[in-house]
């Protein structure tokens, strides 16, 4: 397996922070199975829901989404989002469907009881997207591509440029809390079936 050959332990629990892309989620689940905890990007979820409501309704819906995701407690956040979902069913059913789709995965960091700063960082894909936007800017200047190797070199160059602008993520000192939470979670093991002889 490619991941193993590159030194990635696929048997450890991991937190994957992704956007709503179905193909990426499917690949993660196929590769890591129950050892993959998926955190869907709350920023993408907000945008998707707000795209369905009218301009007049956006401020209040955005305020309720922000308030729900700002809650520290999983049950309280889930209850607030479920309440918003019920409101949206009357206001705009397509917005309600957008909110409901993958909703539970937008609350993974809440279920893990992450400290507020780290939870805010891990709740969106903004960290990686800012790096990729720099790569996009660097690669935009390339006029002729000469095969896959050159593409890899340009992307690598873009990431090296992006690296110079990296800062520590908010909540970086709390990462051991995440590591402990992941270590205590054990995916369901294989059931061992024992047979007894009939007497």
Feature roles, as predicted:
Residues 5-13:
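Short, surface-exposed connector motifs at secondary-structure boundaries
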